[in-house]
Design a protein with these regions (language model features):
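Short, basic interhelical loop/turn and adjoining N-cap
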Residues: 162-175
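Structured, helix-rich domain cores that form ligand/interaction pockets
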Residues: 1-163, 183-205
Length: 206
């Protein structure tokens, strides 16, 4: 037979939804009377950028990758509920906003509770974002993204670019040098402190 430790478990929640609810803080206070310590197992970091989902590209690596087209484009990289799992999706579409007027893309990453701020930044995904000029043809965007992915695999793209018309070449080349989305300076440390603060809230209520 095995013994069950009734004082060991986990709590999963979204601070944005319950962080301001007095009932939730009451729950934390109750838990504080039952446990001697609490540690951060993992947390999801969400970062929104005011860019159309069509103007974002997630760089792939050797991990499992999946793309789903439903209520916008959603890309997944890695294994769910494991550190460095990434999800990039159309937040405006999820909120049922007019995506022609509101451009909002969310980058989510699952973080290990043991990570330092430096490790969090090291695992931050390579997401490229840009602002397409009005009137940009869909085929230019598609070709540009495809060639950018080929270039990341160190495959030749110049031969293909030179097969395009003279006016299309510079437009497509722009997709080969789109900037990466980076977290604001100091943001990783602030988010870690906030995440660990919820553990302190449990222990501090003892």
């Amino acid at each position: 037979s095995c013994k069950v430790n009734m004082h060991r478990g986990f709590l999963e929640f979204n601070p944005n939804k319950v962080g301001g609810d007095k009932r939730f803080h009451g729950l934390l206070k109750t838990l504080g009377t039952c446990v001697s310590k609490a540690r951060l197992k993992r947390f999801d970091l969400a970062y929104d950028i005011p860019v159309s989902r069509y103007d974002c590209r997630l760089s792939k690596d050797r991990r499992m990758y999946k793309s789903v087209i439903s209520n916008g484009i959603t890309e997944y990289l890695g294994v769910k509920n494991t550190p460095a799992y990434v999800k990039v999706y159309d937040k405006a579409a999820e909120l049922h906003l007019d995506t022609d007027k509101v451009q909002l893309t969310r980058i989510e990453m699952t973080c290990d509770g043991e990570w330092t701020a430096e490790q969090l930044e090291e695992h931050w995904p390579q997401v490229h974002a840009w602002h397409s000029e009005s009137g940009t043809k869909d085929y230019i965007r598609v070709i540009g993204i495809m060639l950018a992915e080929k270039a990341e695999r160190n495959e030749d793209v110049e031969t293909l670019i030179n097969m395009l018309g003279r006016s299309s070449r510079p437009k497509v080349r722009e997709y080969l040098r789109t900037p990466l989305v980076r977290l604001p300076e100091g943001a990783a440390a602030l988010m870690l402190a906030e995440a660990h603060g919820w553990c302190d809230a449990v222990v501090g209520s003892m």
